[in-house]
UniProtKB/Swiss-Prot annotation:
This is Peptide chain release factor 1. The keyword Cytoplasm applies. Peptide chain release factor 1 directs the termination of translation in response to the peptide chain termination codons UAG and UAA. InterPro entries: PCRF (IPR005139), Pep_chain_release_fac_I (IPR000352), Pep_chain_release_fac_I_sf (IPR045853), Prokaryotic/Mito_RF (IPR050057), RF-1 (IPR004373). Methylated by PrmC. Methylation increases the termination efficiency of RF1. The keyword Protein biosynthesis applies. The modification N5-methylglutamine is found at residue 234. Keywords: Cytoplasm, Methylation, Protein biosynthesis. Belongs to the prokaryotic/mitochondrial release factor family. One of its GO terms (cellular component) is cytoplasm. Pfam families: PCRF (PF03462), RF-1 (PF00472).
Length: 358
């Protein structure tokens, strides 16, 4: 566990008191007050955690002295309470260390989730549909709102590609480790011989970006308007309402045709474009820091095989943390996914805490 010195604890608490004093000044202008309030909201929980650590350390020192008391009964009581104190202190120091870690600025954001069928043809598309249901139900369990942005349905069911937005507090923090290749092993409905096939789908989770996050020059966009088409290429709309936006500098292309309104299709396409550009910048910054910390959990490489869903064995294995759970139905149903995600978050926290020791 990270050893946090008494001087550092005192400095954290002192900074909170400095902020309180400055915010109480009558001559403080509103812009400065907003900035100080934002810092205070970040410092206050850390200061409370620091005070808790300090209190438990003092309590531990007192109990340690009592274990040497001449009274055997008092000594025995102190030994027992000291064990409880050590456990509480370890938990408090971990909580404080976690609060001191740099936060991912995108954690509290909503997210754009994209699923694309990979190897496996029709079976991969069906699996893409399974993943969509899993994430949609997981979102519902957490009280988040799911909105379909675009979908390319496959003829036998499922999706060749589907994009949804998931809106709520902390969505990205919970789902960001889902990016990567998800593999399924099962007997396809089209398989008459009963042989197990392996198929795959790629998941990408992007933090939702606001207009202020990404500066997009209209002159960098090429916008094409065309007629919507359904499976097999048949026209599904008599008006030119589908929109394709190309961001020329990056080469990113986003198409949207699910809405009957050209205006709504353009708005949805811009939402996805902003998210992709924002994520590209995040990836650039991440790669610059990659030499400082190699993460097994949060690499975010979408070509990395991260998880296998084995139907014959009822097994789900996350390869990044060697986690295997024989609870496939519950996980694909949505609620069971929490156990996997919580394990990934715990591993990421452990890695980041260890990096503070380096």
């Amino acid at each position: 566990m990270i050893a946090i010195s008494p001087d550092r604890l005192a400095a954290i608490i002192a900074r909170r008191e400095e902020l309180q004093a400055e915010m109480a000044r009558p001559d403080l202008d509103s812009n400065r007050l907003v900035a100080l309030s934002r810092e205070y909201s970040e410092v206050e929980p850390v200061a409370l955690a620091a005070e808790n650590v300090g209190r438990l350390r003092e309590e531990g020192e007192t109990l340690e002295a009592m274990t040497k008391d001449d009274d055997p009964e008092l000594q025995a009581m102190a030994v027992e309470e000291l064990e409880a104190n050590k456990t509480a202190l370890a938990e408090a120091e971990r909580a404080l260390a976690l609060s001191l870690l740099p936060r991912d600025a995108a954690d509290e954001r909503s997210a754009i989730l994209e699923i694309r069928a990979g190897t496996g043809g029709d079976e991969a598309a069906l699996f893409g549909g399974d993943l969509l249901r899993m994430y949609s139900r997981y979102a519902e369990e957490h009280g988040w709102r799911v909105e379909m942005i675009s979908a390319s349905a496959a003829e036998l069911g499922g999706y060749k590609e589907v994009v949804i937005s998931i809106t709520g507090a902390g969505v990205f923090a919970r789902l960001k480790f889902e990016s990567g290749v998800h593999r399924v092993q099962r007997v396809p409905v089209t398989e008459s011989g009963g042989r197990i096939h392996t198929s795959a789908a790629t998941v990408a989770v992007l933090p939702e970006a606001e207009e202020v996050d990404v500066d997009i020059d209209e002159r960098d966009l090429r916008i094409d308007i065309f007629r919507s088409s359904g499976p097999g290429g048949q026209s599904v709309n008599t008006t030119d309402s589908a929109v394709r936006i190309t961001h020329i500098p990056s080469g990113i292309v986003v198409s949207q045709q699910d809405e009957k309104s050209q205006h709504k299709n353009k708005a949805k396409a811009m939402k996805v474009l902003r998210a992709r550009l924002y994520e590209r910048e995040r990836e650039r910054l991440h790669s610059e820091r990659a030499g400082q910390r190699k993460s097994m959990v949060g690499s975010g490489d979408r070509s990395e095989r991260i998880r296998t869903y084995n139907f014959p064995q009822g097994r789900v294995t996350d390869h990044r943390i060697n986690l295997t759970l024989h609870r496939l139905p519950e996980i694909l149903a949505g609620p069971g996914l929490d156990e996997v995600i919580s394990a990934l978050i715990a591993e990421d926290e452990a890695e980041r805490l260890a990096s503070l020791d380096d």
